[in-house]
Amino acid sequence: MSYSQTRTQSKAGYDAGVKDYKLTYYTPDYTPKDTDILAAFRMTPQPGVPPEEAGAAVAAESSTGTWTTVWTDLLTDLDRYKGRCYDIEAVANEDNQYIAYIAYPLDLFEEGSVVNLLTSLVGNVFGFKALRALRLEDIRIPVAYMKTFQGPPHGITVERDKINKYGRPLLGCTIKPKLGLSAKNYGRAVYECLRGGLDFTKDDENINSQPFMRWRDRFLFVAEAIHKAQAETGEIKGHYLNVTAATCEEMLKRAEFAKELEMPIIMHDFITGGFTANTTLSHWCRDNGVLLHIHRAMHAVIDRQKNHGMHFRVLSKCLRMSGGDHIHTGTVVGKLEGEKGITMGFVDLLRENYVEKDLSRGIYFTQDWASMGGVMAVASGGIHVWHMPALVEIFGDDSVLQFGGGTLGHPWGCAPGATANRVALEACVQARNEGRDMAREGGDILREAAKWSPELAVALEVWKEIKFEFEAMDTV
């Protein structure tokens, strides 16, 4: 498509033909309204396409525009409904990359629908030929639109009341191997981990209902393990039973069975399952008093490339609106991608009620969550006891620290592995509360605790040389 302007006066009384997008959709004098949905796009225009035209094209193709003028434009008020590119900034130290700020009127979006929101913002425009690459970096949801969403089924405060645990991060573990265990052996591993001191165990995201372990069998053996561990420890325990399924009807059937077994929490793969399924399940969880753990499988397909796709902070905001009580966020110190400033930026967007604009952490807009419940951050992936001081310092209390291999890989077995993590956690929390420097004294804190815990001493020896030192790709 050429960007030269062509116009023909039609008999219908409008200018037919193709004209530059910037004539209609680039409005640098526009001041966004409090009710506008705002978006920050990282654009890489094709050679010869000015950034103003590229930004206007994004605004047009994600709102009311198409490639040519149409006579039906005369039947509505385009000035009321169109998206507007109101600012463009060059990206520092990047060639031919720009941040385009676009404002969308609220009437373009269905109330309470993340599906409709994303269909516009990250729809066909991402295949637009005028752009070599396009990435949605951040969005600002106005309070007027935020109030149309239920948000998390319960939120952080209600979850703590449900499980009666306060003043520390929660401890979890993904059962390994992730695939291949029978339901009975799976339940045995759950029991050993929970009796050893963990608060939660977890289905891997891959576990649904495969030939080696059908979902109903898994639910039954896990329920037996949880009730037995609770009776022995006097603590409330949980296991994230993955109810993700091929249909919403099957998903809800599995959720109902978990409720019948008196399970406190279930799990959903929200990206592969889809936002319609996730919002449906979130509403069910609130109505039925069940917590909802969210896994982000497939997120890196969408968010890992720096110049194309959608940043995880956008997915985080959408998940909080759609609903979930926990979500995986990366660890900063483990095996998965995540730079500290960027990671804690979207962790704050998940947990806090009001987050100020902070470009150093990738936060392009101030976000008011209008008292919506918070989502607990889950740090999971390649972490072990030596990481505990850093994890406690980085993530704080409102988090779940999830040690899979770091529990089940203990030489003495699952229960000692869980005990090692629980001792390490409580030692670090006590040291933090006493005002000790976790960054400088973390190793000493663990070694002191290990004098009274042979399980921790063995774990410290096994994983003393394990590090994951790669440069993070997700940077400002």
From Swiss-Prot:
It catalyses: 2 (2R)-3-phosphoglycerate + 2 H(+) = D-ribulose 1,5-bisphosphate + CO2 + H2O; D-ribulose 1,5-bisphosphate + O2 = 2-phosphoglycolate + (2R)-3-phosphoglycerate + 2 H(+). One of its GO terms (cellular component) is carboxysome. Binds 1 Mg(2+) ion per subunit. Its cofactor is Mg(2+). The basic functional RuBisCO is composed of a large chain homodimer in a 'head-to-tail' conformation. In form I RuBisCO this homodimer is arranged in a barrel-like tetramer with the small subunits forming a tetrameric 'cap' on each end of the 'barrel'. Heterohexadecamer of 8 large chains and 8 small chains; disulfide-linked. The disulfide link is formed within the large subunit homodimers. This is Ribulose bisphosphate carboxylase large chain. The lineage of its organism: Bacteria, Bacillati, Cyanobacteriota, Cyanophyceae, Acaryochloridales.
